[in-house]
Regions:
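Arg/Lys-rich, alpha-helical DNA-contact motif
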Residues: 1-19, 25, 29, 33-34, ...
């Protein structure tokens, strides 16, 4: 489910984000619960993400995982507690 939002922001559900990014729905939910992905709106029981921001963030998460970083370290990088500018 893709929805238009203010400022031409396209919102996307976790299910659709998983389908488009080839990342499992469970992983999307886990990353959200950890604070790696930001929910920008809610519609009933759906958590909606900014499509462009979420896709970019997921690409970074997948890349960092493939480079051997743990989710704990990735969380620090995403939150600005790490050295993201050097990655």
């Amino acid at each position: 489910m893709t929805v238009s939002h203010r400022n031409d922001q396209k919102l996307i559900s976790a299910k659709e984000l998983a389908r488009l990014s080839d990342v499992s729905y469970a992983a999307i939910n886990n990353y959200t619960d950890m604070g790696l992905l930001d929910v920008v709106a809610r519609r009933r029981r759906l958590r909606l993400y900014d499509e462009a921001v979420a896709k970019e963030r997921l690409m970074m998460i997948v890349r960092l995982i493939s480079e051997g970083y743990t989710l704990r370290i990735i969380n620090k990088i995403v939150r600005g507690d790490g050295h993201a500018q050097n990655l």
